[in-house]
A protein has these predicted regions:
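Conserved class I S-adenosyl-L-methionine
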Residues: 1-41
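A short, conserved alpha-helix within the catalytic core of class I
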Residues: 119-128
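Conserved catalytic/acceptor-binding region of the Class I
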Residues: 129-197
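Class I SAM-dependent methyltransferase SAM/SAH-binding core
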Residues: 45-47, 53-99
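A short acidic, Gly/Pro-enriched loop at the edge of an enzyme's catalytic core
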Residues: 99-109
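Short helix-loop-beta connector
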Residues: 39-45, 103
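Conserved Class I S-adenosyl-L-methionine
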Residues: 53, 174-254
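A short beta-strand submotif of the Rossmann-like class I SAM-dependent methyltransferase core
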Residues: 112-113, 121
Length: 254
């Protein structure tokens, strides 16, 4: 194990390039779902909180929405600005879940994709109530990597349990239905979509190193971790590729 865990707003500063290249996108079906269930339109204003490098923001921008990407990590925020700067509907915001800096009752949707597990729930809920328009929607999204659907995914999970610095402590699977019910303040609906990525070894390594709990080059355990990753890839690859399978969970409430 290496140095103590960095603060959430600093965790991904040295992971940005891999995050941009190798993290999964989100299924287009999410837009269709929100159009049907929550009256999403091209006129909708979105606060994408914990927006990172802009992966989720891009989904809503392609639907014609206005998106305020709220991100406390400077390096992640700058990456999103580079990727999305040509879209006039994207607005980069230096803020956090507890202090978005957005005006009162100014957004139709608050979206948190792959980010809710970093939030301070009571303070975040108060801030979300402040910026959300009456009748607006909260949308929490996760790409949940399947842990044991295939022998490859089982082996990859074992690698994370062996080499991940604080993997078990920060994984979003730790968030249970009670925490979600408390955050939404009542009822919410959950929807699931299939998602997947295919990687050669370079992509698999980049996907691993995009995670804040994976030892970076020069840190203790890195070389042993990459050696094990090579072994796993060589064992399970088919035509030079392995497949990451995800369940994309979408929780919708108010």
């Amino acid at each position: 194990m290496y140095s103590p865990s960095p603060a959430p707003e600093q965790r991904f500063s040295d992971r940005v390039e891999n995050y941009v290249r190798y993290r999964p996108s989100y299924p287009q079906e999410i837009i269709t779902l929100l159009q049907r269930e929550a009256a999403l339109t091209p006129q909708s204003v979105i606060a994408d909180v914990g927006s990172g490098t802009g992966i989720s923001a891009g989904l809503f921008l392609r639907a014609g929405c206005t998106v305020h990407g709220v991100e406390p990590n400077r390096d992640m925020r700058k990456a999103a600005e580079r990727l999305l700067t040509t879209d006039p509907n994207f607005h980069s915001v230096n803020g956090s879940a507890q202090a978005t800096t957005l005006p009162d009752h100014s957004v139709d949707f608050i979206v948190a994709a792959q980010a809710f597990h970093w939030f301070n729930t009571p303070e975040t809920r108060a801030e979300f109530t402040r910026i959300l328009k009456p009748g607006g929607h909260l949308v929490l999204i996760w790409n949940e990597r399947k842990l044991d659907a295939t022998p490859f995914l089982c082996a990859f999970e074992t690698l994370l349990l062996t080499f991940g610095t604080d993997y078990t402590a920060i994984r979003h699977e730790n968030i249970d239905a009670m925490a979600l019910h408390s955050f939404f303040g009542g009822a919410y609906d959950t929807f699931t979509f299939a998602n997947e990525q295919h990687f050669d070894f370079e992509g698999l390594q980049g996907r691993l190193l995009s995670s804040s709990y994976a030892a970076a080059a020069g840190q203790p355990g890195h070389e042993a971790m990459i050696a094990e990753l090579h072994r796993i890839f060589d064992t399970h690859q088919v035509s030079g590729q392995v497949c990451f399978e995800y369940d994309t969970r979408v929780h919708v409430g108010h």
